[in-house]
């Protein structure tokens, strides 16, 4: 429409006759989509009309004004005006105008419902939302209605939608609600309310028609969320009677949450029946995690792809005379081989490894526990020669090295982390109480850390008193380990007595080490407590001592871990920007990584400005936080944000950038992540440079281990498959970040590692190698990185070979004869060789990598790769839960025959066969004698002789 026509309609608004004004409004409404800019200049005239109570078509004026504000992208004003237009604003209209305003209305309603609701909301908003609920139910768009109901915290509507939905769709809706509840709700109390509703629907379905396998998992984890251990125990017991593999799978899911206090109660509540004793024992072993440790150990040894040349390359490039580099290299090797049991590098370089002294020796020896972490029963055997004298299994000869003794005790704790093994706990407790041993700080320090790890989350009051006595001695080194051990034992329990004692002692002592440890311990005690920890958080964050505020921000991080809670995020951002202490600001940023790891894609938006902060401590924290939240994801935005920090002017920022990048690039290869090769070269350049800062060298060496951890088969994973934050993993990672103050804490990263594999096991708890599955991607996309190629000529001094003149003349005559023969043969062969080359070239072009491949059990499967996993139909072994395509999966054997091969069994049979072969037969297989080496004349050597 022409501009003059619009002006004519606008002029009608200024007429005295109301009928002419109405005509003007009607005409303008019809052309507002294309002429809103001109109409916007006359909003005052339109406002006068809808404010005039005597005007008969006020609603039409509201509607026109709403359309103008909509095109101006002032959606809230447009919504308020549209709601006043009454019948003109039709919610059912399928237009962009209606859709955007309805979404704005719903968002405002949700925000109001999620707030404290102290302010009143326009009742018309609720009217629109109610109309949308009715529309969703009328159109059978139940998921949309359920989504609005969940976000607006309308439990009545959730119940109504589920009750009124068709029975065939109800199961799907309940499962959808469960996923939303676990992954999206950041309010603990509301999540509990929804879980109670879910349980009632699952129970109803169980009674009427039975549950699907994955619904049993959802029901058991709903019991876990509400702490209903008796119901969970009864569910497992019922399944043992009718579906043993499913009962074992449910137990595995409960165990993976690492909620140790709940698991302990479930075990105690299991019915005791003699007819069921063997299966009950198996379930207890699964719930306790013992079975999974053994399975993971076998798998990590079987799949181990650790490149021996990789660590040798670092070893040859690093100046090991510097204690920091020497210790970092030993820790790097332990991270590389975590859980694999492969300590060959240490054995091959035992003299070099033993050069470490004092606390470096303590940390290095403890790192052996990382390598052998899957075999806790062998702990004393592995550390036998380093245990304190006078103890069972301890060293009986030679001068004692207290740092070795303490490191061995720490290593035993690492191997027993979370096992709560009574014998190990008693052994470490006896050392702490032994007056001959507890006078030595390294021994007591190692024993306390070991005890805390072995009794992780046990809430054992006896151990608390033992450690409290050590803490009361007010010795900086031993007090630090005792305070941290109290936090480990009370982790996730919110124990009031422990909180009171830690707060009291933290504010009374003068030792910074102890103050920091008490703050960190309080963070561990508050793990996963959310709103229940607000009192502790408030008292820590308002303290004048910045070290306690440091503990306060970490407490926020662990209390709200994996929730993406807006209140927690705002609080951490406030302290990251406004606190006067660098330590507090750095820790606040790191804590954001723990709070937001469940929605890591949102991290770059929040971290964008922090990454460019003038404060190097904030930049360091940003790199570490991104690494924690995005570990193993290869998330490009996070990598791009950290990349400038790799060349930062501050040494410790570069260290943090390397560690953060290594965490993100775990298990990547050149095909999935083009930046990997460049990053590895950066690490190599940093640790090889003679005059590089030692902090950067340490970061580069540790990062080299992290990026290929656990034989290239382990990754930092802070949550279970179902999205529950894992206590041990989160605790291990938060203590690892404190290596800033105490480098032996690097060993705690082992608690955060988990295998990246799909492991199928049958109800005998063995791994059938006959089971296989299909992965619908090219193998090279997620395959192991290429191993380092050994250059045989590298690092070897070349010598010029001396030959006699007669030998040269003989070779020349032979060469003439050969040339004559070759000239004739070349003509004959030329034609055929060209044809062969052509055929080979054609074959290469035809040989394209297939888009899928078959993976045998157990197989390496990355978290981001699991969506491509497909189980083969009509296969002998079928998974109990087909939705589970990662981690431990129990299988149904459809043939139930004895003709099966298992991981480890076939290997033993092969070893037995090899033992039966006579030694002479082995010797006869290699009759060729190697030729002598070329004669090399070294003039310098002759002169020396």
Residues of each region from the PLM?
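Eukaryotic intrinsically disordered, low-complexity regulatory tails and linkers enriched
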Residues: 629, 722, 735-945
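Extended alpha-helical assembly domains of large eukaryotic scaffold proteins
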Residues: 1-799
């Amino acid at each position: 429409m022409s501009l003059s026509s619009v002006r004519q309609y606008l002029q009608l608004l200024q007429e005295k006759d109301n009928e002419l004004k109405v005509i003007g409004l009607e005409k303008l409404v019809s052309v507002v989509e294309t002429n809103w800019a001109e109409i916007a200049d006359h909003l005052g005239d339109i406002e006068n009309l809808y404010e005039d109570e005597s005007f008969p078509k006020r609603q039409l004026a509201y509607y026109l004004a709403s359309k103008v504000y909509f095109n101006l992208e002032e959606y809230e004003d447009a919504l308020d005006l549209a709601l006043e237009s009454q019948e003109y604003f039709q919610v059912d209209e399928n237009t962009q105008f209606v859709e955007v305003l309805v979404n704005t209305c719903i968002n405002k309603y949700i925000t109001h419902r999620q707030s404290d609701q102290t302010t009143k909301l326009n009742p018309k908003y609720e009217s629109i939302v109610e109309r949308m609920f009715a529309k969703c139910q009328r159109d059978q768009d139940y998921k949309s209605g359920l989504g609005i109901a969940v976000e607006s915290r309308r439990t009545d509507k959730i119940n109504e939608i589920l009750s009124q939905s068709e029975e065939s769709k109800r199961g799907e809706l309940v499962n959808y609600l469960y996923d939303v509840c676990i992954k999206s709700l950041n309010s603990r109390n509301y999540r509990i309310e929804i879980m109670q509703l879910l349980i009632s629907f699952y129970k109803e379905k169980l009674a009427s028609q039975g549950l699907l396998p994955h619904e049993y998992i959802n029901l058991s984890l709903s019991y876990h969320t509400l702490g209903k251990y008796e119901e969970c125990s009864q569910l497992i017991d019922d399944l043992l009677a009718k579906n043993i593999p499913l009962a074992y799978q449910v137990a595995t899911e409960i165990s993976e949450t690492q909620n140790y206090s709940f698991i302990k109660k479930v075990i105690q509540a299991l019915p005791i029946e003699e007819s069921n004793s063997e299966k009950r024992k198996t379930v207890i072993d699964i719930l306790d995690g013992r079975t999974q440790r053994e399975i993971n150990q076998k798998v990590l040894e079987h799949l181990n792809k650790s490149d021996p040349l990789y660590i040798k390359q670092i070893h040859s490039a690093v100046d090991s005379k510097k204690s920091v580099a020497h210790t970092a290299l030993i820790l790097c090797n332990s991270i590389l081989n975590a859980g694999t049991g492969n300590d060959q590098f240490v054995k091959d370089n035992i003299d070099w490894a033993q050069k470490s002294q004092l606390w470096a020796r303590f940390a290095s020896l403890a790192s052996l526990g990382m390598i052998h972490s899957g075999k806790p029963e062998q702990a004393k055997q592995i550390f036998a020669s380093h245990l304190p004298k006078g103890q069972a299994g301890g060293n009986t000869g030679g001068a004692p090295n207290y740092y070795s003794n303490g490191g061995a005790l720490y290593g035993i704790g690492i191997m027993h982390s979370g096992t709560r093994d009574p014998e190990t706990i008693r052994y470490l407790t006896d050392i702490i109480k032994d007056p001959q041993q507890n006078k030595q700080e390294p021994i007591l320090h190692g024993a306390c850390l070991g005890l805390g790890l072995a009794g992780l989350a046990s809430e054992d009051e006896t151990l608390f008193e033992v450690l409290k006595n050590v803490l009361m001695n007010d010795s900086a080194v031993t007090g630090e380990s005792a305070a941290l051990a109290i936090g480990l034992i009370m982790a996730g329990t919110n124990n009031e007595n422990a909180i009171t004692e830690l707060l009291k002692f933290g504010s009374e002592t003068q030792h910074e080490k102890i103050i920091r440890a008490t703050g960190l311990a309080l963070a561990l005690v508050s793990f996963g407590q959310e709103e229940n920890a607000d009192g502790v958080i408030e008292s820590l964050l308002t303290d004048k001592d910045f070290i306690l505020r440091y503990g306060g921000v970490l407490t926020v991080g662990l209390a709200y871990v994996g929730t993406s809670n807006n209140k927690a995020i705002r609080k951490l951002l406030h302290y990251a920007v406004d606190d006067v202490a660098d330590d507090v600001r750095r820790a606040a940023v790191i804590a954001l990584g723990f709070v937001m790891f469940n929605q890591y894609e949102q991290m770059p938006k929040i971290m964008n400005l922090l990454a460019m902060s003038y404060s190097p401590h904030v930049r360091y924290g940003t790199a570490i936080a991104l690494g924690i939240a995005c570990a193993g994801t290869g998330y490009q935005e996070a990598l791009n944000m950290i990349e400038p920090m790799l060349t930062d002017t501050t040494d410790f920022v570069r260290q943090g950038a390397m560690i953060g990048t290594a965490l993100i690039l775990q298990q990547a290869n050149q095909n999935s992540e083009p930046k990997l090769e460049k990053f590895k070269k950066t690490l190599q350049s940093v640790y090889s440079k003679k005059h590089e800062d030692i902090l950067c060298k340490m970061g580069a060496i540790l990062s080299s281990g992290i990026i290929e951890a656990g034989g290239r088969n382990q990754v930092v994973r802070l949550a279970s498959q179902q999205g529950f934050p894992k206590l041990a993993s989160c605790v291990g990672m938060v203590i690892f970040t404190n290596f800033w103050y105490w480098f032996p804490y690097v060993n705690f990263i082992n608690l955060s590692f988990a295998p990246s594999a799909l492991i199928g096991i049958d109800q005998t708890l063995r791994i059938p190698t006959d089971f296989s599955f299909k992965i619908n991607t090219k193998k090279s996309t997620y395959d192991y990185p290429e191993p380092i190629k050994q250059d045989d000529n590298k690092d070897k001094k070349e010598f010029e070979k001396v030959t006699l003149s007669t030998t040269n003349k003989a070779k020349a005559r032979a060469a003439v004869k050969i040339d004559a023969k070759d000239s004739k043969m070349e003509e004959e062969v030329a034609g055929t060789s060209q044809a062969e080359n052509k055929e080979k070239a054609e074959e290469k072009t035809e040989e394209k990598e297939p888009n899928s491949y078959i993976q045998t059990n157990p197989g390496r499967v990355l978290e981001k790769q699991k969506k491509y996993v497909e189980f083969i139909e009509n296969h002998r072994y079928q998974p109990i839960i087909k939705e589970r395509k990662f981690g431990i999966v129990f299988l149904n054997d459809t043939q139930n025959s004895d003709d099966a091969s298992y991981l480890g069994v076939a290997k033993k049979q092969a070893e037995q066969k090899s033992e039966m072969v006579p030694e002479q037969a082995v010797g006869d297989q290699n009759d060729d004698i190697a030729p002598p080496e070329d004669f090399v004349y070294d003039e310098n050597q002759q002169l020396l002789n």
